[in-house]
A protein has these predicted regions:
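The feature captures the beta-strand-to-loop junction immediately N-terminal to the Walker
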Residues: 10-12
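Conserved ABC ATPase "signature" region
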Residues: 62, 74-91
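Helical segment within the ABC ATPase nucleotide-binding domain
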Residues: 134-147
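H-loop/switch region of ABC-family ATPase nucleotide-binding domains
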Residues: 156-157
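A short, surface-exposed alpha-helical micro-motif characterized by mixed small hydrophobic
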Residues: 162-164
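Conserved ABC ATPase "signature" C-loop
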Residues: 174-175, 190
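ABC ATPase "signature
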Residues: 180-181
Length: 198
């Protein structure tokens, strides 16, 4: 996958999509072969992982920012943007353990999309919050990928959403790539296998 490409990964459960995401994000390592990642990765996977429940929302912004490789000065510049996007201003100095799951997810999403990623990985994470916030998230992801140098790797079962974001598609089955091509052709191949099962 090259810099600036927008790629959707398709496949049924167990196809290997999540494993690839874990390899790219460094959550696990390959048992054979190698994977090379060039750029700052922001993963919209488990949005609330890495939060310390006893820390305030503001403290967690710094914690997650540091985990993502940012300096405190960089986080400081982004802090208010993150808070404003998450729409949790009045709760930002309260411990995250007091937040609803939706508030935590919004804060996690906001941190990850506002750190100026070079590689953005999205795994069905655009279902955060109410309809208005979902639309805000979709707009933000579009804004990020419309910058020429940002690479998007998007895992979804919703083909219409994949078409909206991606130009290339990869269809996986049993840990192997079955098809790799433009998004429309990949969707046809993927949907064709779903129809055969019915």
């Amino acid at each position: 996958i090259h810099r600036g490409e927008t790629v959707a990964l398709f496949g049924k459960n167990g196809a290997g999509k999540s494993t690839i995401l874990k390899l790219i994000t460094g959550v696990c390592f390959p048992t054979s072969g190698e994977i090379t990642v060039n750029g700052r990765v922001s993963a919209l996977l488990e949005l609330t992982s890495g939060f310390d429940p006893e820390f305030t929302g503001r403290e967690n912004i710094y914690l997650k920012g540091q985990l993502l490789g940012l300096k405190n000065s960089e986080i400081e510049e982004l802090e208010q943007t993150i808070i404003d996007f998450a729409e949790i201003e009045e709760y930002i100095d309260q411990p995250v353990r007091t937040y609803s799951s939706g508030m935590k997810a919004r804060l996690g999403f906001s941190i990850n999309v506002n750190i100026k990623p070079e590689i953005l990985i999205v795994d069905e994470a655009l279902s955060v919050g109410d309809e208005e916030f979902k639309n805000k998230c979709i707009t933000k992801v579009n804004e990020i990928i419309n910058k020429e140098d940002v690479t998007l790797l998007f895992v979804t079962h919703i083909t219409s959403t994949a078409k909206e974001f991606c130009k290339r598609g990869i269809f996986m089955k049993d840990g192997k790539i079955v098809y790799d091509g433009n998004i429309e052709e990949t969707i046809k191949k993927y949907e064709g296998t779903l129809k055969k099962k019915k």
